[in-house]
Amino acid sequence: MTDPRILSLQQAVPALRLKTEPADLEHYGRDWTRRWTPNPLAIALPGSVEEVQAVVRWANAQAVAVVPSGGRTGLSGGAVAANGELVLSLERLNKPLDFNAVDRTLTVQAGMPLEAVHNAAREQGLVYPVDFAARGSCSIGGNIATNAGGIRVIRYGNTREWVAGLKVVTGSGELLELNNALVKNSSGYDFRHLMIGSEGTLGIVVEATLRLTDPPPPSNVMLLALPSFDVLMQVFAAFRAQLRLEAFEFFTDRALEHVLAHGAQAPFAEIHPYYVVTEFAAGDEAQEAAAMAAFETCMEQGWVSDGVISQSDAQAAQLWRLREGITEALARYTPYKNDVSVRISAMPAFLAETQALLHDAYPDFDVVWFGHIGDGNLHINVLKPDATSQADFVAACDQVTKLLAQALQRFDGSISAEHGIGLVKKSYLWSTRSAEEIALMRGIKHVLDPHLLLNPGKLFETHDAPTNIPAG
């Protein structure tokens, strides 16, 4: 029997596409965490901004919670619909809308995949420089909702730096046009930046105007083998002093083992405990000489044990696969993921402390580390032992996150660097944000989403949001 609320929605928005088949509910109701059982009311697939507004207004009238949905590649449970929410998928809003050659901006719908954004920019002789391994699956709206970073933050920064303007539907169904792609705008609060990183709890991004830039010069990729993590910052400093770095990524021997088992080619005859893949501007003899000088300095100091530099685009892709292939290689284990950040200078001490802490507390766990050294972001993947039940594993991993949160508080770090808080990390927001900050977040949500219907339960609990803040 069809739920009467679905019939009501069909009557309110007659042209709206709806999906209610069990397979669709499961597909659209979860993200890559695979931790919660999906249980959405239905899947709404609007074909216009006006339909998004109409759905949100209907949700307010019917008191139905709404979960905005993009590519659902998130790793924090931010797109999970497990409590009868209406999933509002933006996948049909997936087209480029406008290119402005003078402003060098590209306006796109929020459901457009990141890879399609890259292609659209490339067609104009420019680039949108934010990039990560899930580029073919993730949507630009989801990137904005989490202020995603990726592999080239060291050169280009996070998503936030490249958003010139937004169109956002608020929790009451109003449409906000934020900043209008202005370069300078000193006219009060910039609500664009409030929406970026808000995880769909304040509004639904429906369109984005993105800044584009010139294509980078030709680059080389170098893979370095390190004898210990303690020397990593010396290697980073040596290369940063000589070269314009595009990326500087690290991973462990355990990460490499999983990627090699997944079909990648071994880069060296011997296994080393730590690796760095770095990309830097090249194209002339001076840059190549600088790269070799940095490498030789590191070898002489004993900071690097071995290295290889790409001689072709194909070899560069092979070297990058060793880093970008980690997530795919680990996927079959359904790892418990943590995505944390500390100041770059604090990374060696933080990693040493947390490695020892996790080894002592959970010696049977296989912990795989990799991350973005250039911006202080570490990814910690815990793999379930075969002899451990899923329930016991999740319970133990919750304790892992608690230990990490306590360590991050000591190091003034963040429990989420780029994946967002979602459901996974909301119990540990205290390690990153003060009680006063969290109270202000709740107050802001109440103003923009007065019935607390947008992505409820994500980022923080909303049942106790204040009710005495004026909406006007």
From Swiss-Prot:
Q: Which enzyme type, at the first EC level? A: oxidoreductase
As recorded in UniProt, its EC number(s) are: 1.1.99.39
For the ligand ((R)-2-hydroxyglutarate), the binding residues are R323, T327, K337, N381, H419
What InterPro entries would the database entry show?
FAD-bd_oxidored_4_C, FAD-bd_PCMH, FAD-bd_PCMH-like_sf, FAD-bd_PCMH_sub1, FAD-bd_PCMH_sub2, FAD-linked_Oxase-like_C, FAD-oxidored/transferase_4, Oxid_FAD_bind_N
Which GO molecular function annotations are given, in alphabetical order?
FAD binding; metal ion binding; oxidoreductase activity
Q: Where does (R)-malate bind?
A: R323, T327, K337, H419
Query: Which SUPFAM superfamilies does the annotation name?
Result: FAD-binding/transporter-associated domain-like, FAD-linked oxidases, C-terminal domain
Cross-referenced Gene3D superfamilies: 3.30.465.10, 3.30.70.2190, 3.30.70.2740, Uridine Diphospho-n-acetylenolpyruvylglucosamine Reductase, domain 2, Vanillyl-alcohol Oxidase, Chain A, domain 4
Known regulation of its activity is: Activated by Zn(2+) ions.
The reaction(s) annotated as catalysed by this protein in its Swiss-Prot or TrEMBL entry are:
(R)-2-hydroxyglutarate + A = 2-oxoglutarate + AH2; (R)-malate + A = oxaloacetate + AH2
Instruction: Tell me which residues make up the FAD-binding PCMH-type domain.
Output: 36-215
Q: Which UniProt keywords apply?
A: FAD, Flavoprotein, Metal-binding, Oxidoreductase, Zinc
Q: Where does Zn(2+) bind?
A: H372, H379, E418
What cofactor does this chain's UniProt record say it requires? FAD
The biological process GO terms on file are: respiratory electron transport chain
Cite the cofactor comment: Binds 1 FAD per subunit.
Source organism's superkingdom? Bacteria
Summary of the function given for this chain in its UniProt record: Catalyzes the dehydrogenation of (R)-2-hydroxyglutarate (D-2-hydroxyglutarate) to 2-oxoglutarate. Also has a low activity on D-malate in vitro. Is functionally tied to L-serine biosynthesis, via its coupling with the D-3-phosphoglycerate dehydrogenase SerA, encoded by the adjacent gene in the locus. Active in vitro with the artificial electron acceptor 2,6-dichlorophenolindophenol (DCPIP), but not with NAD, NADP, or cytochrome c.
Entry's family note:
Belongs to the FAD-binding oxidoreductase/transferase type 4 family.
Binding partners and assembly: Homodimer.
What is the protein name stated in its UniProt record?
Answer: D-2-hydroxyglutarate dehydrogenase
